[in-house]
Amino acid sequence: MSSDTRQTSGGNARSKRRLTDAVDEDGRPTATAEDPTSNPKRQRVSRACDSCRSKKDKCDGAQPICSTCASLSRPCTYRANPKKRGLPTGYIRTLELLWGLVFNKIQGSEEVVRTLLRAANIPSHLATMGKESEGSDTLLSSWKNSIVLKEIERLLTFLEQPEGDQERSARGEIDSPADAEESSVLSPETLEWQLPDSIAVASQSPLASGPSPVRLPRPSTTRLVRDSGTQTIPLGEIEDLTTNGSSHDRPVIASNSAREEHRLPPNPWPLLDIYFSYTQCWFPILEKHDILRTAFRQGDDDQYNSPSAAGDNAALWAVLALASIQQTSISTTRQLSDLPEDRPDPDQLYAKARSLIPTESGTYQLGHIQALLILSLIKLGQQDCAAAWMLVGQAVRSAQSLGLNDPSDATGVEKTAGRSKHVFLGCFVLETLVAAKLGLLPSLRKTDLTKVGLINEDGLEEWHPWEDQTGLRPIESSRSFQRGPLHALSTFNRLLSLMCILNELCCVRQTPANSMSYLGTLERQLQLWVSALPTSYRIDLQTVSTKPASPHIFGLEMMYEAVATAISLQLAVQKNERNGLRRASEGSKRLVSLLQAYMETYSLSATCPTFGIALTLGLPLPCMKKTAPWAFEASHGINHKLQSFSAHLATVWIHNTGSQRRPRHATQQGTHPRSPMAISLPGNNMRLTNLIEESRTGNLSTTDSYLSPTWMRTSNDENAVLSLPTPASSLNIASGVETNPTSQQITHQHRSSVVGKPNSALIMSDLTTPFPASGHHYQQTYDDASLHFNSLADIESTSSAQRPRIAPDLDALFDELASLDGTDR
């Protein structure tokens, strides 16, 4: 038999393929398998033989010998396992059969798997497919390292073997005693998956934290299966795992009752409106869209259980707790009975927010620090300063552990968040306030702020107008608000600069040596601060009824008066001058006037939780009883009344689940109630009387609408400095050394800093410049006579000392103030 050998053309002239034409006995050619006329359509075989695959020849897949190998007289085998794309053949069906076997043989397995599937946040794991982060998926790596996957791969390899090899392997598997023992336990009565007893009573699928024990017929082989797939724990260690085990070591399951606890209260949006209207405007530590996103995702179990959302959830519940207290106080102070009965319980919201904050060994996120600060505001409103001190201290340490106090530290992951700087600065503000109230030394100093810097003032919260969509304002209020810029961010920067002065006052109290010179320095710093304040950040009591100011502007003015009063008191104690207490008394009266204007504009329920501290910041501290006992005797009346007023403000923040009771003011001078929760006031006919009898005299009236202490007035030599225009955005905070300068040292100098000789006893840092010397971002303040800054930059040689205008009849004033909550006069 003859044959023609044809070679394909190529650059190397090598034979690629050899085709043989066969002829029959009559010499006529017969068509081969490669003849296009005999097989016009090309057929694809499922598997080629080993020889054709290695030589890249066409193979018809015939077994035991393909036609190509037969024509070329070469061995033909089908032993090699071909590499295919995608999943191995039978992989999906094997998984289906496996789960069917589990559901059929193990009681309760279907219910347990369903609850695990709901709690596992599967969409977040699917989102990592094809990404670099896929390799770090713990659930995926647990499956790939499990013995179950290895067993499935062994079964699939077995199916791909030739029939003869399959028969031999099958006989070997049957003869295996270990497998025979395992197959003997697969009866419907031997295996059972059960949920923990604490949630087994639930009628539907539970989602409570805790593992699922697997009961085997013999106690010695009982194991608790964990989600790693490769580790088992004896059943006796279940209790230790459920109490001490990490959430990463066991499935997260929660019961229906636990899911109800995670559900937001009915209609939480009014609570969010209250917070963002009256708290966010002066304490902008939150991103509004973060809170809204977290609130909308509360219905999604996967998003709620995500570890990355733990901090945001804690912050959200803290916001709801604070706002719910203010909302509840509306019904308490106004005796309203038509409020919905299903309104949230502030105590439960507070407990929920507190439970979401990790312990000392947990992992903290930025949202956890935000929650701690908001909860400390509640304690400040309740005037439980000891609890607020602990909460703020925990927030400060957590912020430092995340590296928020060191921008140069690149290891702080949380610092990439948009509000990390705001949160750290918020820690500084609250810690300084509580330390000043308790007479303690704050851990954060101005030097810590110089590393972080002030916040950027260009944002939506700076230029968006203030809006009130809540029910805190009286319904009959018809005052129209000017739709001007909110200036929340720049106001927060100015509050920070003011808190730097108060922060140093706390340190001066702890170092009596040479404190007089440093108190003079603080006077000068406060004078520069208020002189640089534009009129849009001041409160005009003459026009506030027709042109109301925003809540945070009221708060800034009240805090300034509180700091000025505290400095006046400290100066009087250091100089041992009884007459010096008159300045502190005047500051207290100005605070009361501001508070009256605020409550007339808004309401008692809308008061800030720091107002109580502002009222009592100028009261003598208990530590002054030894050095200046006359301070308590000389100001006994005003101390008693300010404490009464402060206790009245605390009624907003105290919620009693039983009878609504109001805290009774402290009856002893110089003492501050630790927690107003334990004291009460009788009834709704309480009257706040006049502060002191001598306040009724008419010598306190003045035409000046802006309030300012008399010692804040400038001299002739200082007027040249204070008449300079106010440049750019906000107050800079920088470290420096300053003493009380003389007028000759500052004449004709720019009001950027006042530098003198350093004192070796105590180095005080200064506000180097109220405004940097770049561009005029804000309006000029001191060259325009229409801005009514006569009381702030008056020339003592040409005008007499003036006092702020106070209502001549303070009895009527406080009766009116007490009746703002809806009680009978």
Curated annotation (Swiss-Prot):
The family database entries (SMART domains) matched by this protein are listed as:
Fungal_trans, GAL4
Cellular localisation? Nucleus
Query: Which residue stretches does the UniProt record annotate as biased composition, category Polar residues?
Result: 1-12, 658-672
Q: In what ranges is there compositional bias, type Basic and acidic residues?
A: 18-28, 165-174
Alphabetically sorted, this entry's keywords are: Activator, DNA-binding, Metal-binding, Nucleus, Quinate metabolism, Transcription, Transcription regulation, Zinc
User: Which residues form the DNA-binding region?
Assistant: 49-76
Q: Where on the tree of life does the source sit, at the highest rank?
A: Eukaryota
Q: What is this protein called?
A: Quinic acid utilization activator
Species, as recorded: Emericella nidulans (strain FGSC A4 / ATCC 38163 / CBS 112.46 / NRRL 194 / M139) (Aspergillus nidulans)
The taxonomic lineage of its organism, from the top, reads:
Eukaryota, Fungi, Dikarya, Ascomycota, Pezizomycotina
